[in-house]
Amino acid sequence: MWSLQDSIFTCERNHEGENIIHYLCRNGGVIDLLTFRNAINDENRYLLSEYNRDGKXCMHIVVSQDKVDPINKLMLLMKWGADINSKDQKDGNTVLHIAVLTNNYEVAKWLCQQPGVDMEIINFARKTPYQIACDRANTRMMDLLXKNGARCDVPLKINTARRRASHDYGVKLIRMGESAR
């Protein structure tokens, strides 16, 4: 009988630029992924961190695409060594950012409870998952994140901060080259 245990996968990709694990994360179930459990060894572990043409690794694909059983897929991928805090190449979003953006409360809650998850990590827009929830006025997601330990900091726009400082504290802002009157 043929075994995947000692197999080494080549770098072949499908027409969408996906390796076999990307494909199974998008189109397969947990059972399909489990078929490859013995094949994810030191020689093949790179498949978990490879990016497809959309700039997503396997974890990002699961959170953004799987509506059936994402948590069990994520558990399996993490057991194999996938990074819970890896950022996609397009927006710098982690799986927690994506769960917030897609209003996936169940996955967001589960991710928040995982050891090693960085709830304060910022994407390329310099936003934490909590700040994204705040920008979208998603109070349910904001509450979920806060209850699971997210810092509830929302940066003020620079002009808003200046106006508040000058109004609330009597601070006069002076431009370079001007003198205080």
Swiss-Prot record:
SUPFAM superfamilies: Ankyrin repeat (SSF48403). Keywords: ANK repeat, Host-virus interaction, Inhibition of host NF-kappa-B by virus, Repeat. InterPro entries: Ankyrin_rpt, Ankyrin_rpt-contain_sf, NF-kappa-B_inhibitor. GO terms for molecular function: NF-kappaB binding. One of its GO terms (biological process) is cellular response to tumor necrosis factor. SMART domains: ANK (SM00248). ANK repeats lie at residues 54-86, 91-121, 125-154. Suppresses the host immune response through NF-kappa-B inactivation. Possesses ankyrin repeat domains required for NF-kappa-B binding but lacks the regulatory regions required for dissociation from NF-kappa-B and degradation. Therefore, prevents host NF-kappa-B release and subsequent activation. Belongs to the polydnaviridae I-Kappa-B-like protein family. This is I-Kappa-B like protein C2.
